[in-house]
Curated annotation (Swiss-Prot):
It is found in: Preautophagosomal structure membrane. It comes from Coccidioides immitis (strain RS) (Valley fever fungus). Its main location: membrane. CDD domains: Ubl_ATG12 (cd01612). This is Ubiquitin-like protein ATG12. PANTHER family: AUTOPHAGY PROTEIN 12, UBIQUITIN-LIKE PROTEIN ATG12.
Length: 182
């Protein structure tokens, strides 16, 4: 059985055992003999230079924040005012949009394929107009696709579809009597 060394009290400076005293002494002497990390020795006499232990000063880059957008190298112009941007959108929706109907296989062909519609109308209006031109009954289905890629929602704006998916300034609407795409 080994005896556990007594626990020193917080206020006592006397080491608990002679072995720990020699350890502390050895550690302190080793630390004193080693130069500090980052300290530079004077090349003339081998002693540490007091200037070498000073922290590295921060550099002032001279940048003044915030940088104005007119002085920015990246931006070539200022963004539009919100009211002006909204007015531009309303002006686009006030005009007319050209819609070209393209029949898919098994769909009847229209005599005239190009029509104009107000940009503020919903895509539902385009589908109703197409059903009327094809003389569809209430039970007949008409499937419409923009650019033969996707079927837009009936509540989509025709002007928005035209702005995003126009081809040669026309909105290409493919139609079929049966589902053509997945």
């Amino acid at each position: 059985m080994s005896a556990t060394p007594p626990i020193p009290s917080p206020g006592s400076s006397k080491p608990s055992s002679p072995r720990s005293a020699s350890r502390n002494l050895g550690l302190n002497t080793r630390q004193a003999s080693r130069p500090q990390i980052g300290a530079r020795r004077d090349t003339n006499n081998g002693s540490e230079s007091p200037a070498a232990t000073a922290p590295i000063p921060d550099e002032d880059h001279g940048a003044e924040l915030p940088l104005t957008m007119t002085a920015s190298v990246i931006l070539t112009g200022l963004p539009k005012d919100a009211h002006r941007a909204l007015a531009d959108v309303e002006a686009i929706d006030a005009g007319k949009v050209t819609v070209r109907f393209h029949p898919l296989p098994s769909a009847p062909i229209l005599r005239n394929r190009v029509f104009k519609i107000s940009a503020s109308q919903k895509f539902e209006t385009v589908v109703r107009f197409l059903r009327k031109k094809l003389d569809c009954s209430e039970s007949d289905s008409v499937f419409c696709y923009v650019n033969s890629v996707f079927a837009p929602g009936l509540d989509e704006s025709v002007g928005g579809l035209w702005r995003c998916f126009k081809t040669d300034d026309q909105l290409i609407v493919s139609y079929s009597m049966t589902p053509a795409f997945g």
